[in-house]
């Protein structure tokens, strides 16, 4: 039912609608007098930069977009209509920078900036405390030849196949907060402060931490599965474990294997405390350390939310999130296929798994945004097809 402009009597309260187009959706009305139940409220401009305090009953507003459902008076039903094809010609398939349809709707942040920063700082502090214990354990092992603390960290703070074999499943989580050296710790902490704070600000503390820890565990699982495929001492047994899942949930008692000696990989810095393990494959004694899978997941969610946002890589190179993350995913996936993990001592498969986990998580966290993007892209493609047919 259409409403003529002459029946709308209420005016605009300090409208700032000069260059930024603002759109709302007017619900269906029975009579023109029903407009009196509306109240003025603040809406965001399409550029996300300015605010406009307007009256919803103003006849000057285009009836095109919609605001979040919670901002409209609860007694009035909404008619969720969306036009996927924008007005005006387009030269490129991708929309311009900071386009409204590729960004999440404003005003839907689940946390405050102070809480988001506090959560990121707490995660960084936990990483620092765990790294301090690792450094203290290495120092005691090298200088004092006291391996008690070092053996405890190797047993409970790193993810390895042998730890899972002995039932220490929590190492999949604790290893996310462990790091190899100071450079590894600093790089991950900078990334955590940059990306995790934004994810917490957008989705809230519990959802953000669930994605963070879930991506870290998933990355460790994929990397350990790759190690298990390389060397498996139980491969010849009829009921032996063939997957990491079998170690987490054993079907029955497996044959005992000898305990590995102190082992920290092939880093020459810790040569004096490295020992070879008897009857235990190297891949089973090698542990995984680091929060790279979780960090890549938060970076992937950030790229999905704000693909045209630029950030400085290593504080030097400005890159766009929507361009850098796909290129990095392809590069690390190629390195996984070429088996460069042992050469660089980097779990590239954990990075790839974390990125994949972040993208899939964004599909569940913001389904409306992905639906809007798909409709928008389909509309552009159809419009191009129709224009080409018209020219032909």
Curated annotation (Swiss-Prot):
Keywords recorded for this protein, A-Z: Hydrolase, Membrane, Mitochondrion, Mitochondrion inner membrane, Protease, Serine protease, Transit peptide, Transmembrane, Transmembrane helix
Residues spanning the membrane: 115-135, 150-172, 185-205, 208-225, 277-297, 299-319, 321-341, 350-370
Q: Where in the cell is it found?
A: Mitochondrion inner membrane
Q: Does the keyword rRNA-binding apply?
A: no
The main place the protein resides is mitochondrion
Output the InterPro entries linked to this UniProt entry: Peptidase_S54_rhomboid_dom, Rhomboid-like_sf, Rhomboid_protease_S54
Q: Name one GO biological process term.
A: signal peptide processing
Transit peptide: which residues? 1-34
One cellular component term (GO) for this entry is: mitochondrion
> Where, by residue number, is the active site?
292, 351
List the membrane topology term(s).
Multi-pass membrane protein
Q: What is its EC number?
A: 3.4.21.-
Q: Which Gene3D superfamilies match?
A: Rhomboid-like
Q: Which domain of life does this protein belong to?
A: Eukaryota
- Give a GO molecular function annotation for the protein: serine-type endopeptidase activity
Family per record = Belongs to the peptidase S54 family.
Please report the name of this protein according to its UniProt entry.
Uncharacterized rhomboid protein P4H10.10, mitochondrial
């Amino acid at each position: 039912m259409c409403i003529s402009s002459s029946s709308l009597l209420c005016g605009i309260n300090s409208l700032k609608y000069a260059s930024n187009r603002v759109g709302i959706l007017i619900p269906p009305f029975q009579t023109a007098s029903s407009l009196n139940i509306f109240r003025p409220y603040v809406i965001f401009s399409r550029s996300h930069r300015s605010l406009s305090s307007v009256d919803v009953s103003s006849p000057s507003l285009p009836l095109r977009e919609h605001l979040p459902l919670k901002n409209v008076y609860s007694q009035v039903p909404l008619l969720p209509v969306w036009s996927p094809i924008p007005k005006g010609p387009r030269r490129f398939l991708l929309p311009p920078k900071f386009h409204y349809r590729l960004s999440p709707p404003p005003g839907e942040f689940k946390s405050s900036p102070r809480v988001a920063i506090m959560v990121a700082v707490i995660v960084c502090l936990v990483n620092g405390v765990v790294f301090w214990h690792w450094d203290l354990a290495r120092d005691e092992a090298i200088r004092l030849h006291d391996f008690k603390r070092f053996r405890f960290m190797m047993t409970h703070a790193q993810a390895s196949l042998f730890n899972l074999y002995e039932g220490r499943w929590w190492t999949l989580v604790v290893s996310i907060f462990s790091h190899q050296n100071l450079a590894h710790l600093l790089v991950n902490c900078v990334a955590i402060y940059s990306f995790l704070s934004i994810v917490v600000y957008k989705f809230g503390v519990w959802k953000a931490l669930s994605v963070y820890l879930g991506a870290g565990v998933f990355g460790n699982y994929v990397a350990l599965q790759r190690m298990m495929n390389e060397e498996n001492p139980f491969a010849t047994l009829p009921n032996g474990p063939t997957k990491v899942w079998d170690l987490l949930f054993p079907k029955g008692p497996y044959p005992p294997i000898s305990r590995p000696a102190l082992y920290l990989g092939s880093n020459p810095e810790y040569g004096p405390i490295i020992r070879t393990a008897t009857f235990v494959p190297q891949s089973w004694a090698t542990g995984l350390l680091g929060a790279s899978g979780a960090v890549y997941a938060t970076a992937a969610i950030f790229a999905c939310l704000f693909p045209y946002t630029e950030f400085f890589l290593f504080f030097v190179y400005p890159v766009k999130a929507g361009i850098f993350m796909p290129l990095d995913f392809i590069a690390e996936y190629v390195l996984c296929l070429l088996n460069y993990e042992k050469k660089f001592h980097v779990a590239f498969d954990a990075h790839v798994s974390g990125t994949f986990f972040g993208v899939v998580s964004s599909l569940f966290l913001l389904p409306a945004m992905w639906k809007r993007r798909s409709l928008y892209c389909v509309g552009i493609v159809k419009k191009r097809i129709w224009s080409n047919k018209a020219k032909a």
